[in-house]
């Protein structure tokens, strides 16, 4: 009997998060749904959200047809980097939440790097 796709993704995410917690740096966590993208930066111990951005916010939503394409990923990546730098965070660990580093996840990460985050 095989495990489900989402269960396998969550298992990969758990392993990654344990490794990142040992590093002791803030983590950029990404959630991808069929319609939207969400990005949050957590403290090193994972207890508090420092900055957040998603495709439901008006700064990102303006000018987009929908929140599930690569243009939306670029806007979310730039916005999360801008908000992180505003609170003094420039070095993070990227938590892709078990998703493949491909498509919207990769585009969001590249946009955040271009906007000044280091990971």
Swiss-Prot record:
A cellular component annotation (GO) from this entry: cytosolic large ribosomal subunit
Listed GO MF terms: 5S rRNA binding; structural constituent of ribosome
Family to which this protein belongs: Belongs to the universal ribosomal protein uL18 family.
Matching InterPro entries: Ribosomal_uL18_bac-type, Ribosomal_uL18_bac/euk
Protein's organism: Xylella fastidiosa (strain Temecula1 / ATCC 700964)
Quaternary state and interactors: Part of the 50S ribosomal subunit; part of the 5S rRNA/L5/L18/L25 subcomplex. Contacts the 5S and 23S rRNAs.
NCBIfam families with a match to the protein in the record: L18_bact
Keyword terms: Ribonucleoprotein, Ribosomal protein, RNA-binding, rRNA-binding
Function: This is one of the proteins that bind and probably mediate the attachment of the 5S RNA into the large ribosomal subunit, where it forms part of the central protuberance.
Biological process (GO), any one: translation
Name this protein carries in UniProt: Large ribosomal subunit protein uL18
């Amino acid at each position: 009997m095989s495990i489900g796709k989402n269960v396998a993704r969550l298992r990969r995410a758990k392993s990654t998060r344990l490794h990142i917690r040992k590093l002791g740096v803030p983590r950029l966590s990404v959630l991808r749904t069929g319609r939207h993208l969400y990005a949050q930066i957590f403290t090193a111990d994972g207890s508090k959200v420092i900055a957040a951005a998603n495709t439901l916010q008006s700064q990102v939503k303006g000018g987009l047809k929908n929140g599930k394409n690569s243009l939306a990923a670029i806007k979310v990546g730039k916005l999360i980097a801008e908000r992180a730098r505003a609170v003094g965070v420039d070095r993070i660990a990227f938590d892709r939440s078990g998703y493949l580093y491909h498509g919207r996840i990769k585009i969001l990460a590249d946009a955040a790097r271009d906007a000044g985050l280091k990971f």
